[in-house]
């Protein structure tokens, strides 16, 4: 969420910067609400001052033994007016808050201006795509040939965009997650957290999924328990399946003041993620690239504001290290203003090479959200006895497990349809070097 004081003092600059993201700022709505707020706030302050003055007069009159009935009646009337004005002010401030919750973050000055992914900047590449002397198969064909990916049964169980992994491939998927966690905790200094997969609406508002992106989430109905918890049906019980572990990990510091000496905080979690993929109809309908349920190892850093952009570079490096250890070619892209996520001030995407597509595809997105999420969550730090300040929050995939599996299937495929296990994973696979029929 943006700083309301910044909006009031520097509105035109903010409108211009948000326009670079393709966001049309609701100027008329904001100015109308601000006008109402000022008017009602002035009225409230005037009534409070009058009531305070009248109360003093009552005290003085009583000391003198004078009749205070008229002043008492006036104060009673003022109390009713004041309550009405306070209710109006609260209603206007609520509407302002709702408007603020729908405004995206400001892009950092180092982010290139652009409309979409075609305007992103390539920062670097690592590794050389392998050349094959046989026809390359895509990951779905390889998995089905090995009888280790079953889309048909998954569709029977759950519908489209689900999959069953079996045998050696299920084991490889598990090995990947374990390898990623070990690397991040043992080499990169992250603290592993096991998080709930169901979160409340406050968590989703804190990280920016609500209220704007509710259609991308899976809400959970709990039947009789929901009715018991919410008998007046004033709103949903509020639990959703997590779209990413970023949500629970970042919200660990919601409504918290972290001592400066405890910074930075580095969290890692391996979880399933659940997304409706509402805006992706017709895209990546075959295979594991875009699923309603997928596993991801998520990295979150909570930092001092002056350290967050340095932390972003290290976060990207931590994700890159996984691909380097797996010897998978990739490139790092700096996203332009028009391609960044809602909460991000700056984002790097890491894209892995997929031979069957002859293209680099996103496998990690690493973002610095600066104070945007912290303001929504009231996540702060304090130096000694000084006034608390907002933290900066960062997140990134380290990595998406399913997409990493896709990259291994395609980059490590053999002519006979088997898959060579990357050397770094063999210890996690009981020494197995190849998966085949």
From Swiss-Prot:
GO terms for cellular component: cytoplasm. Keywords: Aminoacyl-tRNA synthetase, ATP-binding, Cytoplasm, Ligase, Nucleotide-binding, Protein biosynthesis. CDD domains: SerRS_core. Its main location: cytoplasm. The keyword Nucleotide-binding applies. It is an enzyme of class 6 (ligase). Pathway: Aminoacyl-tRNA biosynthesis; selenocysteinyl-tRNA(Sec) biosynthesis; L-seryl-tRNA(Sec) from L-serine and tRNA(Sec): step 1/1. Consists of two distinct domains, a catalytic core and a N-terminal extension that is involved in tRNA binding. Homodimer. The tRNA molecule binds across the dimer. Catalyzes the attachment of serine to tRNA(Ser). Is also able to aminoacylate tRNA(Sec) with serine, to form the misacylated tRNA L-seryl-tRNA(Sec), which will be further converted into selenocysteinyl-tRNA(Sec). This is Serine--tRNA ligase. It comes from Nitrosomonas europaea (strain ATCC 19718 / CIP 103999 / KCTC 2705 / NBRC 14298).
């Amino acid at each position: 969420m943006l700083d309301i004081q910044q909006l009031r003092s520097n509105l035109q600059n903010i409108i211009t910067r948000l326009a670079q993201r393709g966001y049309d700022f609701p100027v008329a709505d904001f100015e109308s609400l601000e006008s109402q707020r000022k008017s009602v706030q002035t009225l409230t302050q005037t009534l409070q001052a009058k009531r305070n003055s009248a109360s003093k007069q009552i005290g003085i009159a009583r000391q003198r033994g004078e009749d205070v009935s008229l002043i008492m009646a006036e104060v009673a009337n003022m109390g009713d007016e004041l309550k009405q004005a306070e209710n109006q002010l609260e209603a206007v401030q609520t509407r302002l808050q709702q408007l603020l919750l729908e405004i995206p973050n400001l892009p950092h000055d180092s982010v290139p201006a652009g409309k979409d992914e075609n305007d992103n900047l390539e920062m670097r590449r690592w590794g050389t795509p392998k050349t094959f002397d046989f026809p390359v198969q895509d990951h779905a064909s390889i998995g089905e040939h090995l009888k280790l990916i079953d889309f048909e049964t998954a569709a029977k169980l759950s519908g489209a965009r689900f999959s069953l992994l079996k045998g050696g491939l299920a084991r490889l998927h598990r090995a990947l997650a374990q390898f990623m966690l070990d690397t991040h905790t043992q080499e990169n200094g992250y603290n592993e957290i096991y998080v709930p997969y169901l979160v409340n609406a406050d968590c989703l508002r804190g990280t920016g999924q609500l209220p704007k992106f509710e259609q991308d989430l899976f809400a959970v109905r709990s039947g009789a328990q929901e009715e018991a918890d919410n008998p007046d049906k004033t709103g949903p019980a509020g639990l959703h399946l997590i779209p990413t572990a970023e949500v629970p990990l970042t919200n660990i510091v919601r409504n918290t003041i972290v001592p400066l000496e405890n910074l930075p905080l580095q969290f890692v979690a391996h979880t399933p993620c659940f997304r409706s993929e509402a805006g992706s109809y017709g895209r990546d309908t075959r295979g594991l690239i875009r699923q309603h349920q997928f596993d991801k190892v998520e990295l979150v850093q909570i930092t001092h504001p002056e350290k967050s952009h340095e932390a972003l570079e290290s976060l990207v490096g931590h994700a890159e290290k996984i691909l380097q250890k797996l010897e998978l070619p990739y490139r790092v892209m700096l996203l332009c203003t028009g391609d960044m996520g809602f909460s991000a001030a700056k984002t790097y995407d890491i894209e892995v090479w997929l031979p069957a597509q002859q293209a680099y595809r996103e496998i990690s997105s690493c973002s610095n959200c600066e104070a945007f999420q912290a303001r929504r969550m009231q996540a702060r730090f304090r130096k000694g006895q000084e006034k608390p300040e907002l933290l900066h929050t960062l997140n990134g995939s380290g990595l998406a497990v399913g997409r990493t599996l896709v990259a291994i299937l395609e980059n490590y495929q053999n002519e006979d349809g088997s898959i060579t296990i990357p050397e770094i994973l063999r210890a996690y696979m009981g020494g197995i070097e190849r998966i085949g029929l």
